[in-house]
Amino acid sequence: MPEMPEVETVRRTLRPLVVGKTIDHVDIWYDKVITGDPETFKRELKGKTFTAVDRYAKFLLFRLGDLTVVSHLRMEGKYHLTTWDAPVDKHEHLQFAFTDGSSLRYADVRKFGRLQLVETGTEFQVTGLKNLGVEANSPEFRLDYFEKGLKKRSMNIKSLLMSQTLVAGLGNIYVDEVLWQSRINPLTPANELTKDQVKQLHSAINETIEEATKYGGTTVHSFLNAEGGAGHYQEKLKVYGKEGQPCPRCGEDFVKIKISGRGTTYCLHCQKR
Protein backbone atom coordinates (compact mmCIF):
# COMPACT_ATOMS: atom_id res chain seq x y z
CA MET A 1 0.00 0.00 0.00
CA PRO A 2 1.35 3.47 -0.84
CA GLU A 3 2.21 5.22 2.41
CA MET A 4 2.64 8.93 3.04
CA PRO A 5 5.97 9.38 1.17
CA GLU A 6 4.60 7.53 -1.86
CA VAL A 7 1.34 9.51 -1.92
CA GLU A 8 3.26 12.77 -1.55
CA THR A 9 5.44 11.72 -4.49
CA VAL A 10 2.30 11.01 -6.54
CA ARG A 11 0.93 14.43 -5.57
CA ARG A 12 4.10 16.21 -6.63
CA THR A 13 4.22 14.45 -9.99
CA LEU A 14 0.48 14.88 -10.61
CA ARG A 15 0.29 18.58 -9.88
CA PRO A 16 2.03 19.88 -13.03
CA LEU A 17 0.13 17.37 -15.17
CA VAL A 18 -3.40 18.40 -14.18
CA VAL A 19 -3.55 21.81 -12.49
CA GLY A 20 -5.21 24.30 -14.82
CA LYS A 21 -6.91 21.62 -16.92
CA THR A 22 -10.68 21.65 -17.38
CA ILE A 23 -12.79 18.49 -17.36
CA ASP A 24 -14.82 17.90 -20.52
CA HIS A 25 -16.36 14.73 -19.10
CA VAL A 26 -15.68 11.83 -16.76
CA ASP A 27 -15.78 8.18 -17.83
CA ILE A 28 -16.30 5.53 -15.16
CA TRP A 29 -15.70 1.92 -16.18
CA TYR A 30 -16.05 0.41 -12.70
CA ASP A 31 -18.82 2.03 -10.65
CA LYS A 32 -17.58 0.77 -7.29
CA VAL A 33 -14.47 2.92 -7.57
CA ILE A 34 -16.76 5.81 -6.59
CA THR A 35 -17.99 6.31 -3.04
CA GLY A 36 -21.44 7.73 -3.66
CA ASP A 37 -23.42 7.99 -6.89
CA PRO A 38 -21.30 7.63 -10.07
CA GLU A 39 -23.76 9.65 -12.17
CA THR A 40 -23.65 12.54 -9.72
CA PHE A 41 -19.85 12.34 -9.74
CA LYS A 42 -19.79 12.67 -13.54
CA ARG A 43 -22.41 15.38 -13.72
CA GLU A 44 -20.96 17.62 -11.01
CA LEU A 45 -17.40 17.51 -12.37
CA LYS A 46 -18.23 18.39 -15.97
CA GLY A 47 -16.69 21.79 -16.75
CA LYS A 48 -14.71 21.97 -13.49
CA THR A 49 -11.02 22.97 -13.50
CA PHE A 50 -8.28 21.41 -11.35
CA THR A 51 -6.92 24.21 -9.16
CA ALA A 52 -4.61 22.23 -6.86
CA VAL A 53 -3.59 18.75 -5.78
CA ASP A 54 -3.27 18.46 -2.00
CA ARG A 55 -2.68 15.55 0.35
CA TYR A 56 -3.46 14.51 3.90
CA ALA A 57 -1.64 11.40 5.15
CA LYS A 58 -2.35 8.73 2.50
CA PHE A 59 -5.23 10.61 0.83
CA LEU A 60 -5.00 12.77 -2.31
CA LEU A 61 -7.29 15.80 -2.52
CA PHE A 62 -8.02 17.10 -6.01
CA ARG A 63 -9.27 20.68 -5.67
CA LEU A 64 -11.82 21.92 -8.19
CA GLY A 65 -13.05 25.17 -6.69
CA ASP A 66 -16.06 24.47 -4.50
CA LEU A 67 -15.66 20.71 -4.97
CA THR A 68 -12.92 18.30 -3.88
CA VAL A 69 -12.28 14.73 -5.01
CA VAL A 70 -10.82 12.72 -2.12
CA SER A 71 -8.83 9.75 -3.43
CA HIS A 72 -7.45 6.83 -1.44
CA LEU A 73 -5.11 4.63 -3.49
CA ARG A 74 -5.34 1.69 -1.05
CA MET A 75 -3.14 -1.22 -2.22
CA GLU A 76 -2.45 -0.69 -5.91
CA GLY A 77 -4.07 2.54 -7.10
CA LYS A 78 -2.19 4.60 -9.71
CA TYR A 79 -2.78 7.71 -11.80
CA HIS A 80 -1.28 8.45 -15.21
CA LEU A 81 -1.80 10.96 -17.99
CA THR A 82 -2.84 9.77 -21.44
CA THR A 83 -5.40 10.79 -24.11
CA TRP A 84 -9.17 10.38 -24.36
CA ASP A 85 -8.96 7.89 -27.16
CA ALA A 86 -6.12 5.71 -25.84
CA PRO A 87 -7.16 2.03 -25.52
CA VAL A 88 -8.67 1.29 -22.12
CA ASP A 89 -6.66 -1.22 -20.09
CA LYS A 90 -8.65 -3.79 -18.10
CA HIS A 91 -7.27 -2.33 -14.86
CA GLU A 92 -8.27 1.26 -15.70
CA HIS A 93 -11.49 2.21 -13.94
CA LEU A 94 -11.96 5.95 -14.47
CA GLN A 95 -10.77 8.88 -16.54
CA PHE A 96 -11.02 12.63 -16.23
CA ALA A 97 -11.16 13.63 -19.91
CA PHE A 98 -9.84 17.18 -20.35
CA THR A 99 -10.83 19.77 -22.92
CA ASP A 100 -7.32 19.70 -24.45
CA GLY A 101 -7.70 16.03 -25.44
CA SER A 102 -5.58 14.62 -22.63
CA SER A 103 -6.99 12.56 -19.77
CA LEU A 104 -6.05 11.51 -16.27
CA ARG A 105 -6.77 7.83 -15.71
CA TYR A 106 -7.04 5.86 -12.51
CA ALA A 107 -5.87 2.24 -12.63
CA ASP A 108 -6.12 -0.29 -9.82
CA VAL A 109 -5.34 -4.00 -10.18
CA ARG A 110 -6.92 -4.87 -6.83
CA LYS A 111 -9.93 -2.52 -7.19
CA PHE A 112 -9.63 -1.42 -3.55
CA GLY A 113 -9.06 2.31 -4.15
CA ARG A 114 -11.91 4.80 -3.88
CA LEU A 115 -12.75 8.34 -5.02
CA GLN A 116 -15.32 10.49 -3.23
CA LEU A 117 -16.71 13.86 -4.34
CA VAL A 118 -17.43 16.33 -1.53
CA GLU A 119 -17.91 20.04 -1.03
CA THR A 120 -14.56 21.70 -0.41
CA GLY A 121 -14.15 22.29 3.32
CA THR A 122 -16.18 19.26 4.39
CA GLU A 123 -13.59 16.58 3.63
CA PHE A 124 -12.63 16.17 7.29
CA GLN A 125 -16.26 15.67 8.30
CA VAL A 126 -17.66 13.34 5.63
CA THR A 127 -14.79 11.15 4.38
CA GLY A 128 -12.30 8.71 5.89
CA LEU A 129 -10.17 11.71 6.87
CA LYS A 130 -12.42 12.28 9.89
CA ASN A 131 -10.96 9.23 11.66
CA LEU A 132 -7.29 10.14 11.24
CA GLY A 133 -4.81 11.49 13.73
CA VAL A 134 -2.34 14.27 12.92
CA GLU A 135 0.10 13.78 10.05
CA ALA A 136 3.56 12.40 10.70
CA ASN A 137 6.32 14.98 10.25
CA SER A 138 3.88 17.89 10.56
CA PRO A 139 3.86 20.86 12.99
CA GLU A 140 0.88 19.25 14.75
CA PHE A 141 2.83 16.06 15.45
CA ARG A 142 4.47 17.45 18.57
CA LEU A 143 6.33 15.31 21.08
CA ASP A 144 3.93 16.24 23.91
CA TYR A 145 0.92 15.28 21.74
CA PHE A 146 2.56 11.93 20.97
CA GLU A 147 3.42 11.24 24.61
CA LYS A 148 -0.11 11.98 25.83
CA GLY A 149 -1.69 9.89 23.09
CA LEU A 150 0.50 6.88 23.80
CA LYS A 151 -0.24 7.01 27.53
CA LYS A 152 -3.97 6.65 26.80
CA ARG A 153 -3.60 3.52 24.68
CA SER A 154 -2.76 -0.01 25.79
CA MET A 155 -2.66 -1.74 22.38
CA ASN A 156 0.73 -2.81 21.07
CA ILE A 157 2.73 -0.06 19.41
CA LYS A 158 2.79 -1.73 15.98
CA SER A 159 -1.01 -1.97 15.81
CA LEU A 160 -1.46 1.56 17.14
CA LEU A 161 0.83 3.10 14.53
CA MET A 162 -0.91 1.08 11.81
CA SER A 163 -4.35 2.26 12.97
CA GLN A 164 -3.74 5.89 11.84
CA THR A 165 -5.77 7.17 14.80
CA LEU A 166 -2.90 8.84 16.69
CA VAL A 167 -0.50 9.63 13.88
CA ALA A 168 -1.45 9.24 10.22
CA GLY A 169 0.63 8.34 7.18
CA LEU A 170 2.64 5.31 8.28
CA GLY A 171 2.06 1.83 6.88
CA ASN A 172 3.71 -1.54 7.30
CA ILE A 173 7.03 -0.60 5.69
CA TYR A 174 7.75 2.51 7.69
CA VAL A 175 6.34 1.21 10.98
CA ASP A 176 8.79 -1.70 10.89
CA GLU A 177 11.61 0.70 10.02
CA VAL A 178 10.93 3.26 12.76
CA LEU A 179 10.46 0.61 15.47
CA TRP A 180 13.79 -0.95 14.52
CA GLN A 181 15.50 2.44 14.54
CA SER A 182 14.06 3.11 18.00
CA ARG A 183 14.94 -0.39 19.31
CA ILE A 184 11.29 -0.93 20.30
CA ASN A 185 9.68 -4.35 20.27
CA PRO A 186 6.55 -4.13 18.09
CA LEU A 187 4.46 -6.00 20.69
CA THR A 188 5.18 -3.47 23.45
CA PRO A 189 1.97 -1.88 24.80
CA ALA A 190 1.97 1.78 23.76
CA ASN A 191 1.43 3.02 27.30
CA GLU A 192 4.49 1.12 28.54
CA LEU A 193 7.01 2.94 26.37
CA THR A 194 9.58 4.93 28.34
CA LYS A 195 10.03 8.66 27.86
CA ASP A 196 13.30 8.04 26.02
CA GLN A 197 11.67 5.47 23.73
CA VAL A 198 8.85 7.86 22.88
CA LYS A 199 11.36 10.59 22.05
CA GLN A 200 13.41 8.25 19.86
CA LEU A 201 10.30 6.96 18.10
CA HIS A 202 8.99 10.48 17.47
CA SER A 203 12.31 11.48 15.90
CA ALA A 204 12.53 8.27 13.87
CA ILE A 205 9.04 8.79 12.43
CA ASN A 206 9.76 12.35 11.33
CA GLU A 207 13.21 11.60 9.93
CA THR A 208 12.10 8.47 8.07
CA ILE A 209 9.09 10.13 6.46
CA GLU A 210 11.24 13.08 5.38
CA GLU A 211 14.02 10.93 3.95
CA ALA A 212 11.67 8.48 2.20
CA THR A 213 9.88 11.40 0.55
CA LYS A 214 13.21 12.81 -0.60
CA TYR A 215 13.94 9.49 -2.32
CA GLY A 216 10.54 9.40 -4.04
CA GLY A 217 9.06 6.72 -1.78
CA THR A 218 9.60 2.97 -1.68
CA THR A 219 8.96 0.58 -4.55
CA VAL A 220 8.98 -3.00 -3.23
CA HIS A 221 5.98 -4.32 -5.16
CA SER A 222 4.36 -2.10 -7.76
CA PHE A 223 4.43 1.55 -6.64
CA LEU A 224 4.96 4.07 -9.44
CA ASN A 225 4.50 7.83 -9.41
CA ALA A 226 2.26 9.71 -11.87
CA GLU A 227 5.13 9.89 -14.37
CA GLY A 228 5.64 6.13 -14.25
CA GLY A 229 8.81 6.33 -12.15
CA ALA A 230 9.72 4.07 -9.24
CA GLY A 231 10.79 5.20 -5.79
CA HIS A 232 14.31 4.63 -4.46
CA TYR A 233 13.96 4.41 -0.68
CA GLN A 234 13.87 0.61 -0.88
CA GLU A 235 17.66 0.86 -1.18
CA LYS A 236 17.72 2.39 2.32
CA LEU A 237 15.46 -0.10 4.12
CA LYS A 238 17.10 -1.77 7.11
CA VAL A 239 14.47 -4.28 8.25
CA TYR A 240 11.31 -4.44 6.11
CA GLY A 241 11.34 -7.48 3.83
CA LYS A 242 14.59 -8.79 5.31
CA GLU A 243 13.39 -11.81 7.29
CA GLY A 244 16.29 -14.22 7.88
CA GLN A 245 18.92 -11.64 6.99
CA PRO A 246 21.37 -10.29 9.59
CA CYS A 247 20.49 -7.15 11.49
CA PRO A 248 22.97 -4.45 10.40
CA ARG A 249 23.26 -3.31 14.02
CA CYS A 250 23.93 -6.57 15.88
CA GLY A 251 24.22 -9.33 13.27
CA GLU A 252 21.36 -11.49 14.59
CA ASP A 253 18.93 -12.69 11.93
CA PHE A 254 15.67 -10.79 11.60
CA VAL A 255 12.48 -12.71 12.39
CA LYS A 256 9.00 -12.22 11.00
CA ILE A 257 5.72 -12.60 12.88
CA LYS A 258 2.13 -11.50 12.33
CA ILE A 259 0.62 -8.71 14.40
CA SER A 260 -3.04 -7.88 13.77
CA GLY A 261 -2.76 -9.80 10.52
CA ARG A 262 0.23 -7.82 9.22
CA GLY A 263 3.68 -9.27 8.61
CA THR A 264 6.15 -7.70 11.04
CA THR A 265 9.92 -8.02 10.76
CA TYR A 266 12.16 -7.14 13.69
CA CYS A 267 15.33 -8.06 15.61
CA LEU A 268 14.94 -10.22 18.71
CA HIS A 269 18.23 -8.90 20.11
CA CYS A 270 17.94 -5.17 19.42
CA GLN A 271 14.19 -4.94 20.00
CA LYS A 272 13.73 -6.79 23.28
CA ARG A 273 10.60 -6.48 25.42
UniProtKB/Swiss-Prot annotation:
GO molecular function: 8-oxo-7,8-dihydroguanine DNA N-glycosylase activity; class I DNA-(apurinic or apyrimidinic site) endonuclease activity; damaged DNA binding; zinc ion binding
InterPro entries: DNA_glyclase/AP_lyase_DNA-bd (IPR015886), Formamido-pyr_DNA_Glyclase (IPR020629), FPG_cat (IPR012319), MutM-like_N-ter (IPR035937), Ribosomal_uS13-like_H2TH (IPR010979), Znf_DNA_glyclase/AP_lyase (IPR000214), Znf_FPG/IleRS (IPR010663)
Record: residues binding DNA: H91, R110, R153
Cofactor entry: Zn(2+)
Residues the record marks as active site: P2, E3, K58, R262
Zn-finger segments (FPG-type): 238-272
Family statement drawn from the similarity comment of this UniProt entry: Belongs to the FPG family.
Protein's job: Involved in base excision repair of DNA damaged by oxidation or by mutagenic agents. Acts as a DNA glycosylase that recognizes and removes damaged bases. Has a preference for oxidized purines, such as 7,8-dihydro-8-oxoguanine (8-oxoG). Has AP (apurinic/apyrimidinic) lyase activity and introduces nicks in the DNA strand. Cleaves the DNA backbone by beta-delta elimination to generate a single-strand break at the site of the removed base with both 3'- and 5'-phosphates.
Subunit structure: Monomer.
Protein name: Formamidopyrimidine-DNA glycosylase
Source species taxonomy: Bacteria, Bacillati, Bacillota, Bacilli, Lactobacillales
Encoding gene, per UniProt annotation: mutM
